[in-house]
Amino acid sequence: DCLGIAGHPDVKTPYLDSLAAEGTYFPNAYSACPSCIPARAALFTGLSQEHHHRVGYQDGITWDYPHMLPAALSDGGYHTEMVGKMHVHPPLYRCGFQNMTLHDGYIGYYRNPNAPAKEHQLFHDSYLHWLKCRCGYDADVNDAGLECNSFLVKPWPYDEMSHPTNWTVSESIRFL
């Protein structure tokens, strides 16, 4: 309902409108849950929130589901890759994806210096490693004004192509 093609009077979404006009548009679609992690669990497992028991992010709660869509696709011969954020535990749990290029930043637990090394963001966050190589070791997303589920904002201090959204798009195109 927040798309130009849906008739919203103020929101301008020309690129999404173009994709919808040229492809398939689902005007009655809805998310099983409007929060990213429970919605991801619903998409991956086919279970409702009542049955997958995710209400949001919780540190250290494993994703222990017997069946997940990425695994079924991989088993069916599809080449699967996850690009972007997963926010699952443990951090490098594949959920059935064959390859993962992650940006799982923002969450305090994984930035805690006392977290086990394999769970620390510097170990598993592909984007953070890339950003530090591109913009210098001191480059940091959280200090740049981006925080998980926050309304706080600051101007992005790096070049536009270094932004997590552009990195995710570039990595997705590289995969395709």
What is each PLM-predicted segment?
Residues D1-L176:
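Formylglycine-dependent sulfatase
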